[in-house]
């Protein structure tokens, strides 16, 4: 692309440089006229051709920028025209767009910062007076990782470095392309570093085995689409060794993905090593179900199987008392509805409002059902849980035991038990005493027995047992009249067989 007068279509008396349709089409094709250029996968063609076109575009934009003030005549005094000529209006609009593009390409602070940082790194190396000093790919990527530069800005940075005489490695573009394609890995590395740091809470701390596993993830590199397709084809091979090799390649290349997904499910009841193991099982499930012929990327397909395996394990194993999976989904629906109503109403919703939000009676939700779901969603608290700032007290120290007796109550209860035992021994036969104790639930029996249960125990028909029981009760009532003691067990007629 050329910037001479013939190509520009410049007229002697024009206030703005006029662009030919061919040049405008070329600029649009290279996306210079777009303010926010969307990210596209970097395609490396001939770098010399790219640098040539880019320098021509920037040189042309600089020419427009320098001539902006000199070409525009002074404004005349008087009334302004209602409408500018259409041709001049289009030129002004296009000029403003090109000026904005010029600023984004030349005056980008992040771009200049990256260039300055890499130049300083090169100068520090040059002071050592070594031969064949080269700026390594690792040094370049470490600086680029701190800034979110678009594709064209990164290539512009490399061109500027080459123009300054800084030697770069021949495969720098390919390494940057790999870095851009695997940007998720940098986020995963930050997660892994956070997990292995000393600042995480006790609940999130991982044991030595998990630390060793996280430290050994350097060999886990995400595969590109072509490599995944090539390896996935081997999964259908009849050779057992080839299939094992393909499975091993897909597993090792996606271990970081498992760690990234597992970290998002911390603080939900399972240890981190358990989450990783469940995620690995989901990864193996994805490998067995993957169909390469559909053209999907394996990492995208495996993400859903890993998430399903982890969430299912949390639902089955995280709670002390297991809640069915369908009830866990209902609890999640209720929590989502509660958050939506809170944002809408600006207050905590009532159970009636939640029931209506969940579908009402048509879906089987009422106030009683909502209260039951809320009760199930509560996590059990350990009595040994430490409380307070000093963490010396336990939660169980503050829980009242409703079955506990005071010394006075214990003494009275013990005295009544002795008198009852004496009353039974003095007035009833062994068989009658046994039947009364079993029917009422007196020691050594902890709960009342039915007539059938008593009959099976002493091998007597239930009707006979009922007769013996009534006879024994009459004897006890007669004895109580002479020795008034509070005996609630004598109200046998209130019991139901």
Curated annotation (Swiss-Prot):
PANTHER family: RNA POLYMERASE SIGMA FACTOR RPO, RNA POLYMERASE SIGMA FACTOR RPOD. Belongs to the sigma-70 factor family. RpoD/SigA subfamily. GO terms for molecular function: DNA binding; sigma factor activity. Residues 74-84 have a biased composition (Basic residues). Residues 423-478 are annotated as: Sigma-70 factor domain-4. This is RNA polymerase sigma factor SigA. Residues 63-73 have a biased composition (Basic and acidic residues). It is found in: Cytoplasm. Pfam families: Sigma70_r2, Sigma70_r3, Sigma70_r4. It comes from the Bacteria. Residues 250-320 are annotated as: Sigma-70 factor domain-2. InterPro entries: RNA_pol_sigma-70_dom, RNA_pol_sigma70, RNA_pol_sigma70_r2, RNA_pol_sigma70_r3, RNA_pol_sigma70_r4, RNA_pol_sigma_r2, RNA_pol_sigma_r3/r4-like, RNA_pol_sigma_RpoD_C. GO terms for biological process: DNA-templated transcription initiation. HAMAP family: Sigma70_RpoD_SigA. Interacts transiently with the RNA polymerase catalytic core. The keyword Transcription applies. Residues 451-470 bind DNA. Residues 1-20, 62-86 are annotated as: Disordered. Residues 329-410 are annotated as: Sigma-70 factor domain-3. Sigma factors are initiation factors that promote the attachment of RNA polymerase to specific initiation sites and are then released. This sigma factor is the primary sigma factor during exponential growth. It comes from Mycoplasma genitalium (strain ATCC 33530 / DSM 19775 / NCTC 10195 / G37) (Mycoplasmoides genitalium). Keywords: Cytoplasm, DNA-binding, Sigma factor, Transcription, Transcription regulation.
